[in-house]
Curated annotation (Swiss-Prot):
The lineage of its organism: Eukaryota, Metazoa, Chordata, Craniata, Vertebrata. GO terms for biological process: ATP synthesis coupled electron transport. This is NADH-ubiquinone oxidoreductase chain 4L. Core subunit of respiratory chain NADH dehydrogenase (Complex I) which is composed of 45 different subunits. Core subunit of the mitochondrial membrane respiratory chain NADH dehydrogenase (Complex I) which catalyzes electron transfer from NADH through the respiratory chain, using ubiquinone as an electron acceptor. Part of the enzyme membrane arm which is embedded in the lipid bilayer and involved in proton translocation. GO terms for molecular function: NADH dehydrogenase (ubiquinone) activity. It comes from Caperea marginata (Pigmy right whale). PANTHER family: NADH-UBIQUINONE OXIDOREDUCTASE CHAIN 4L (PTHR11434:SF0), NADH-UBIQUINONE OXIDOREDUCTASE SUBUNIT ND4L (PTHR11434). Signal peptide: none annotated. Gene3D superfamilies: 1.10.287.3510. Belongs to the complex I subunit 4L family. The keyword Iron-sulfur does not apply. Its EC number is 7.1.1.2.
Amino acid sequence: MTLIHMNIIMAFSMSLVGLLMYRSHLMSALLCLESMMLSLFILATLTVLNSHFTLANIMPIILLVFAACEAAIGLALLVMISNTYGTDYVQNLNLLQC
């Protein structure tokens, strides 16, 4: 395992620890999730490039599409919660029942 792989895995781990520590605010959780997705994208891209498996070239792009969808839904929830309650606490997500 190269130094680049170790750094990316460490970045993913730090993002996961940040997500577990700062889970009370939605904005902090979304930032940690975005950094996790970015490190997964870089790791997937490096893995595909190192393996020379041409059929898997689309996998990092699909991961980016899912990351963009996750970010859009998360920001929509953040705007909805902050407009309704004035804060971005995750505990307010339980109050959004339809």
